Amino acid sequence: MSDERLAERPADEADEQRPPVRPLDSVDRDILRLLRADGRASVRSVADQVHVSRANAYARINRLLEDGVIRGFSARIDQERAGHGTSAYITLKIVQDSWRSVRERLRELPGAAHMALVGGDFDVLLLVHTKDNRSLRDLVLTRIQAIPEVLSTRTLLVFEETDLDPEP
């Protein structure tokens, strides 16, 4: 979003502070699709592609930011070229009702890229990127397994990653 300053939203607002969900129309969905493909697209470019005025596109993008639909803008990174030759999904079983404290500890980990509380055979799915296998081993054995609420872990090495393109 290079040509205007858009609303900034704290990365981690509490759920009770979030505005109610507003329905998205086809123009909103088109804007999201375009920004997902190119988060650096200018408001003017977005407006032209969805056939609305620049002011309308600006207002819509700002609303999507304020409502928390757009959580931010980021770059897609080739982890290997960035010096992270090893990626892994780590599954964790944790003590019941400890998600919030475990989440805060996992956020501090170097290379943690994504985490989710899930249902099934394990409780947490964590994606990490590390320099090499030794760094991954150290991360799992000395950092993650040292968290008192973590009961067990299982590490799944990633052999190849593919970013999915936005829907047409």
Pin down the residues of each PLM region:
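A compositional/biophysical signature of low hydrophobicity enriched in polar/charged and small residues
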Residues: M1-P168
